[in-house]
Amino acid sequence: MWQKLAWIALAGAGGTLSRYALSGLVQNLCGASFPWGTWVVNGLGCFLFGMIWALAEERLLITGEIRFIVLTGFMGAFTTFSTFAFEASQFLRDSEWLLAAIHLIGQNSLGLVCVFLGFTISQII
């Protein structure tokens, strides 16, 4: 158990550092007028999440344990948007249109509200 937690933590550190480096690089190249770094990180994270899932699930090229460590540790730290998109794609793949809509609209709305609340509360304190 502890060994698995250590691997997840190590993968998480790698994801965090990768996000910081890639996002910063893209922002420096594209300018700070729009969050292109976040877009690139989230897009790449979604792509990698789907690829890793398929390699483990459909082609059996990655073991379930390695997949768990990479998706939970690295991708969890690199971007949680990849998990969000994957969950939405599963609803769509299963033709659960209402659940997909609730998930997509709800998560985005909740995120915006939470960011606004955090910003507002931090100004009051």
Swiss-Prot record:
It is a multi-pass membrane protein. One of its GO terms (biological process) is cellular detoxification of fluoride. GO terms for cellular component: plasma membrane. It is found in: Cell inner membrane. Keywords: Cell inner membrane, Cell membrane, Ion channel, Ion transport, Membrane, Metal-binding, Sodium, Transmembrane, Transmembrane helix, Transport. GO terms for molecular function: fluoride channel activity; metal ion binding. It catalyses: fluoride(in) = fluoride(out). The chain crosses the membrane at residues 6-26, 36-56, 68-88, 97-117. It comes from the Bacteria. Disulfide bonds: none annotated. Na(+) binds at G76, T79. Na(+) is not transported, but it plays an essential structural role and its presence is essential for fluoride channel function. The keyword Ion transport applies. PANTHER family: FLUORIDE EXPORT PROTEIN 1-RELATED. Belongs to the fluoride channel Fluc/FEX (TC 1.A.43) family. Fluoride-specific ion channel. Important for reducing fluoride concentration in the cell, thus reducing its toxicity. This is Fluoride-specific ion channel FluC. It comes from Nitrosococcus oceani (strain ATCC 19707 / BCRC 17464 / JCM 30415 / NCIMB 11848 / C-107).
